[in-house]
């Protein structure tokens, strides 16, 4: 244990309020071996409990209503925690900004990413999925199934090319798009840029330079959030950093989410057959089966937690949360509430057919003003991906083992991959 833990224990001794219940177990280790460990601890100690993780004191809060109330009651006492990218650009991720600075950058970005602007690009985004998956299917062999790395590379290419088109506006496979695609491979060839060194600094600088040159040389060219931000007068060095890192983090998250979609597609062929025959237009009321499939996948996986740090001592529900404590707002566990989702560990997309759930039941993209600005884009791309797969292929899962805790998210088994069998009338 390091000094923040000793500080917390000392504060607990001298405060009129006790620390939350819970033993000093190493939660980061125990959770890797039991994904339901936090649910077990909440059942034992109640919805607010403490533990040790990564040599720090953590307080976990389960239940979306409770998590939202904690944020609203303590906005001035907590700060979002995320990957530190200030080595790449000074002010860092949008998600770690607070107050007026956060509002200053978030508002124009949300306007630039409005649904109708992105939905108009869907006819250009679908061919990316079709082309990359067709190439993947052509190169597969029944006797030698594709390596997991081959599937990851294909999904990374899809997510990267789609987000480059949405954020930077250049048509896929254009000269500028190809330079950006290569630049992102240099920035994070093996996934999310977690630790930045000289190589990442050089790659980030190269991306920054080519984007600035393109915006300067073709400022009025149609399409892309960056050009809309430039036209609004909201494009500065920090916004450029946000744009670059939104693609970097987004392509990593989408690649992982596409893997989950394929896993559930392989496990539920009858549902995929129904999606293949479904009208692509969303119904006037409720959700299509494809969109419901995406929502249920977010409920089951990938939407896991929000993390905050206590900037000062906090008293919440009678418990002391000392300064420096990390607070984990447990989304994955909250989405397993049986009173809202009967059979919470079963995959049932039908539960979303009547429509999206209210935020006190289901909130995969955040709980406050830091709600993910790419939320509806992720939904659009997930739905597009499911439809593309369902309409053209039957999915055979290979090595669909126990999920594991990855560097940032839970992931399907490291050996998981798929065979794509073309449906009648569709060539690989």
Can you say where each PLM-predicted feature lies in the sequence?
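Conserved cytochrome P450 K-helix/beta-meander segment immediately N-terminal to the heme-binding cysteine loop
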Residues: 330-356, 365
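Residue-level recognition of short, solvent-exposed, well-ordered loop/turn junctions
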Residues: 322-323
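Cytochrome P450 heme-thiolate "Cys pocket" and heme-binding signature region
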Residues: 353-414
């Amino acid at each position: 244990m390091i000094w923040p833990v000793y500080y917390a224990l000392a504060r607990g001794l001298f405060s009129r309020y006790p620390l939350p219940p819970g033993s000093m177990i190493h939660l980061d280790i125990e959770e890797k071996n039991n994904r339901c460990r936090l649910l077990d601890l909440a059942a034992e100690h109640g919805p607010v409990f403490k533990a040790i993780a990564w040599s720090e004191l953590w307080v976990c809060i389960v239940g979306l209503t409770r998590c939202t109330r904690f944020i609203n009651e303590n906005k001035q006492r907590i700060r979002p925690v995320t990957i530190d990218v200030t080595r790449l650009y000074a002010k860092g991720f949008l998600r770690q900004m607070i107050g007026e600075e956060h509002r200053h950058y978030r508002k124009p970005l949300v306007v630039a990413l409005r649904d109708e602007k992105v939905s108009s690009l869907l006819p250009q985004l679908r061919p990316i999925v079709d082309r990359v998956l067709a190439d993947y299917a052509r190169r597969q062999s029944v006797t030698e199934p594709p390596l997991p790395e081959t599937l990851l590379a294909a999904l990374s290419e899809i997510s990267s090319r789609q987000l480059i088109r949405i954020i930077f506006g250049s048509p896929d496979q254009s000269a500028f798009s190809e330079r950006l695609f290569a630049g992102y491979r240099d920035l994070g060839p093996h996934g999310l840029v977690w630790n930045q060194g000289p190589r990442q600094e050089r790659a980030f600088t190269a991306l920054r330079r080519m984007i600035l040159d393109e915006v300067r040389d073709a400022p009025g060219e149609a399409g892309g959030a960056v050009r809309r931000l430039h036209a609004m007068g909201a494009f500065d060095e920090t916004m450029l950093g946000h744009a670059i890192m939104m693609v970097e983090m987004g392509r990593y998250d989408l690649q992982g989410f596409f893997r989950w979609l394929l896993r559930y597609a392989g496990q539920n062929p009858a549902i995929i057959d129904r999606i293949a025959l479904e009208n692509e237009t969303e119904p006037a009321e409720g959700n299509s089966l494809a969109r419901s499939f995406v929502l249920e996948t977010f409920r089951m996986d990938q939407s896991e937690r929000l993390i905050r740090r206590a900037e000062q001592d906090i008293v919440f529900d009678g418990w002391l949360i000392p300064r420096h404590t990390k607070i984990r707002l447990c989304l994955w566990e909250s989405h397993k509430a049986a009173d809202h989702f009967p059979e919470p560990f079963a995959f049932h997309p039908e539960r979303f057919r009547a429509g999206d759930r209210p935020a006190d039941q289901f909130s995969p993209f955040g709980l406050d003003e830091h709600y993910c600005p790419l939320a509806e884009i992720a939904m659009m791309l997930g739905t597009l991906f499911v439809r593309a797969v369902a309409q053209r292929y039957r999915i055979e899962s290979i090595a669909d083992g126990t999920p594991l805790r990855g560097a940032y998210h839970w992931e399907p088994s490291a050996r998981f991959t798929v065979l794509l069998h073309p449906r009648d009338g569709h060539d690989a």
